Structures are given as structure tokens and as C-alpha cells.
């Protein structure tokens, strides 16, 4: 059987031009509105080794965006608001290979109550997700050793997050058009 997760991984490998990774172990992140998972892919097996214990990254982005009056799904508009804004330092909640994203919601509500601008809140939201994914990636590479990292899912089409992860981890990314559901399979 070809799982939903396997479909995202195959589409990501194909669109990133790294199908040959199937021949060796690699890490894969699937980060979207429906899931935020860290997967170990080896010998044709996909095993979940980490991810969120509560909200997904996409849910957090959309909830913040809706609160800011953006159209759902909110990722692209939130990113536009965040462009060129230096975000406040994010303190993601990551233990090992598990993250908690729900705290972001409380922080953005507090920022709104403090009268912070939509742009500042958008930039902080993206920075929180970026910092969370960076910490998870670093922890996974420390635990499993150096190996390629693949990023897929709608949230990974955010240019701010992609550029940071490309620079820090030389990750491969699904093209945005291959990051949606049913991109493969």
C-alpha cells in the first residue's frame, strides 16, 4: 500500500531532484496544516521518530493569520506581512525530537493585546516555526548522525523558512506545487 505520508515523500524526492536518496537513509520533515512530523526513511520504510505533541505548524500559522484578519489558508499572506521585519527572538519548546507549538498561539495573542503590529506578529510566528524546525533538525542529526534532510509540506514553501534551512542544513525541498496533498499517488 502507498500511504499518504509516502506520497508526500515521493513527491518531495522527485521535485527536489533527489530520487537517489531512496537508496540510503535520510530524514524527512512533513510540515503542513495536517501534520508536523519528523520521519526516518531507510530501506523503503518510513518511521515517525518525532514531531509535534500538539498543534501542527500549519494550524498555528492559520490560527494566527485568521486572528490578524487574513484569508484562510494564511501562510502566503502571513509571509508577505513578515517580509523584511526583524522578528522578536523565538523560544521554541523542543525536547529531543518532540516539539510543542501551542505556546506560539498564547504568545501571539499576548502580542496582539500589547498592540504589536500585524507585521511583527507575522514575523514572530514564522520565526517560531523556523526555530522549532531548526532545533528538531539539529537534534535529529545529532542523534542519528549526518544524513540528508528532506523538507515537504505546505509550510515548507515559506521562503523565509526554506532559505534558513537550506543555509544551515543544506536540505532538499519539495517544490511548492509538489507540497500539497495528492501531489503524488
Name each model feature, range by range.
Residues 9, 33, 154:
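Active-site glycine-centered loops adjacent to acidic/histidine catalytic or metal-binding residues
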Residues 11-12, 38-41, 160-162:
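Short glycine-/acidic-enriched loop or helix-start segments at secondary-structure transitions
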Residues 1, 30, 153, 176:
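Small/polar loops that bind or transfer phosphate-bearing groups
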